[in-house]
Amino acid sequence: MVNFTIDQIRAIMDRRENIRNMSVIAHVDHGKTTLSDSLIQRAGIIADKVSGDMRYMSCRADEQERGITIKSSSVSLHFEMPKEDKLPAGCTSHEFLINLIDSPGHVDFSSEVTAALRVTDGALVVIDCVEGVCVQTETVLRQAVAERIKPVLFVNKVDRFLLELQLNTEEAYLSFRRAIESVNVIVGNTEDKEFGDVTVSPEKGTVAFGSGLHGWGFTLGRFAKLYAAKFGVPEDKLMGRLWGDSYFDATAKKWTSNPQSADGKALPRAFCQFVLEPIYQLTRAIVDEDAVKLEKMMKTLQITLAPEDAEIKGKQLVKAVMRKFLPAADAILSMIVTHLPSPLVAQKYRCANLYEGPMDDECAVAIQKCDPNGPLMMYVSKMVPTSDKGRFYAFGRVFSGIIRTGQKVRIMGVNYVPGKKDDLFLKSIQRTVLMMGRKTEQIEDCPCGNIVGLVGVDQFLVKSGTITTSEVAHNIRVMKFSVSPVVRVAVEPKNPSDLPKLVEGLKRLAKSDPCVLCYSEESGEHIVAGAGELHLEICLKDLAEDHAGIEIKTTDPVVSFRESVSEESSIMCLSKSPNKHNRLFMKASPISMELQDLIEAGSDISSKDDPKARANYLADNHEWDKNDAMNIWSFGPEGNGANLLVNVTKGVQYLNEIKDSFVGAFQWATKEGVVCDENMRGIRFNLYDVTLHTDAIHRGGGQIIPTARRVLYAAELTASPTLLEPIYLVEITAPENAIGGIYSVLNRRRGIVIGEERRIGSPLFSVKAHLPVLESFGFTADLRSHTAGQAFPQCVFDHWASIGVVNKDKKATEVALATRKRKGLAPEIPDLDKFHEKL
């Protein structure tokens, strides 16, 4: 069954130009896991018979039951390229190692996709040809391009065109073309010079078509090969002719771009005539049971069926014949090997995105060259639970050097700063393993460019981190998730004596999922926060069954809010220190929505930028005063949030002495706003004037920190404080007769429809709407009951929107008071007099 050994795989691991690291990404239910089956079966890991139904990559019981992927899982495939195929540039051997990661398509788990993308260099994007590009396809594609990952495309479920919708060849072509165009629109609008052009097109060979369930697929190269001999035209020339507006005029025996022949007849498009027509004919012959025609075609195409397939009929026979004619795995694996980059190529342009340190230190140079003799640099992107309760494999990618069993390494957590001792551990690796879907295989060592699991480092890392042997190494950048944990529940054990188990379980849960947040409130509640309802449900199930192993009670889901302001402070706020010797003057004003999003994305502007470059950027693009922009003291909360502390004072003595205390107070205040203890977002605090005591002893941290916090709160309260709630972008696919039901459900839940369009070539409509997360609980069930189960919603976190001004608008005030009550704070929103003082 397995036709390669671990030693063979280990041998290829050293040939970096023959390695391909790739992930399979797509919208939910577009057939990633089923397609991965065909590829794994080609490598001989599972038997031919069960391929397509087995879902080898779904390792968990609940994944098998629900039929969705929840965690990404990885497998290493050994692929031998056919001898007659042209080898990619720089390769000398026909044997390749493909590390394939199957990732979830459901939007709630897109943090799993991010973790998978970080350790790979290429992505196989799967699209359902009937549904086209959906919300989640768009999200993951954007993420892939941002991580500088090269896509190739597989248009899946073509069998539905033949057997279910019965479209003619021209309609099928138009449908394919539209799907490919929408992918190119998403990946094409990046202006990344080093990364180059990443658009996909069939004539380049970066698009394959087929059916994952039936196990057949092809690229244009396959047909170009068939016809090259017949027409006497070289293959690569023919590939360009088999797509787009090119037609073959049989009477004049020449190619033309004119859809009419010399004598005025309409010509069929080359793609329809030479590629789709044979497939349609073959399928039709089987479905109509036309044995004579079938035999003749099979003879021409040199297809011979196995003896045991002689008796089958109908769809099963279609599957058997098409698999022999166009095996999917061969087409896709050669596309991956030919068009996706090896670590050697990819790390050159990915290094700048990955590494936080300077681009000329030893680690950066080793990463760019993918150098096995350089210092070890490995990024751990997630933790994978082992069969041994409570222990995890650290799953990641080696970017340079070699990692060995028993090697002493430096384990650096997310908060590690070079030169300091925090979040740094010196430990040795217990074992290195190869991840093979449901199993793991032990290996001695693993050279750079490969994906590997480690045993024995899980106690030192929370979710992700960097492992290195170099003393000067900086961290590899933290991943940016497209979803944020906005839905929270409080958990408690049914039996109070189980509390220690719950706490231990929460720690393990936080490790096992890249996106989940576990923390305790001051009121003593334990909170679990997730990206959405489904994500939370899976996390709680894991917590009860695996991580804690106890029965738990949960509260209703609650939503996180953000506090913001809507105008500049109405008065200059003043606070005096407890000893009355120091005075701080401050105002607050809102930051534009656009700038808030940029800061949170961390791409164009972040706290780590060079202050001068940042000031120029703000002055040119966001109409900031250059002097103000130079004097940004801090971003908050956590040192990177979307609130700014700006020093606009003129000629104040001793100001630098209190800067650290002030920044500390700012981080504290922005983490717990005054309205209801939620994070602040989008507030710019301007420090106008400071009067300090001349004696250093009277202006220590104990005097400044509480005063600064009070003046920050006063500034927020005088600037019309608002509450922001998270909003989902919902995409709903449904037939026409269900549209009415969708609208009524959305209206009841404060949803706003922003667009509806018909999917060409299919009977489905797609409706896009904005829906407050607060109203989204039970939305799916409600929607299904109103549309007789025909509507499928997908929710993805989109933006923050204001509910209204606190103490003016009824809704905002109610929400604020309810949140205060839930957190056990004083029932009323504090008065301004508590914070603002008279001169």
Swiss-Prot record:
Record GO cellular component, one term: phagocytic vesicle
Keyword Iron-sulfur: no
Diphthamide modified-residue sites: H698
CDD domains: aeEF2_snRNP_like_IV (cd01681), eEF2_snRNP_like_C (cd04096), EF2 (cd01885), EF2_II (cd16268), EF2_snRNP_III (cd16261)
SUPFAM superfamilies, per the entry: EF-G C-terminal domain-like, P-loop containing nucleoside triphosphate hydrolases, Ribosomal protein S5 domain 2-like, Translation proteins
One of the GO BP terms on file: response to bacterium
Modification after translation: Phosphorylation by EF-2 kinase completely inactivates EF-2.
Pfam families for the chain: EFG_C, EFG_III, EFG_IV, GTP_EFTU, GTP_EFTU_D2
Keyword check for Protein biosynthesis: yes
Domain (tr-type G): residue spans on this chain: 17-248
Family, as annotated: Belongs to the TRAFAC class translation factor GTPase superfamily. Classic translation factor GTPase family. EF-G/EF-2 subfamily.
Function (record text): Catalyzes the GTP-dependent ribosomal translocation step during translation elongation. During this step, the ribosome changes from the pre-translocational (PRE) to the post-translocational (POST) state as the newly formed A-site-bound peptidyl-tRNA and P-site-bound deacylated tRNA move to the P and E sites, respectively. Catalyzes the coordinated movement of the two tRNA molecules, the mRNA and conformational changes in the ribosome.
Name of the protein this chain belongs to: Elongation factor 2
Record organism: Dictyostelium discoideum
Taxonomy of the source species: Eukaryota, Amoebozoa, Evosea, Eumycetozoa, Dictyostelia
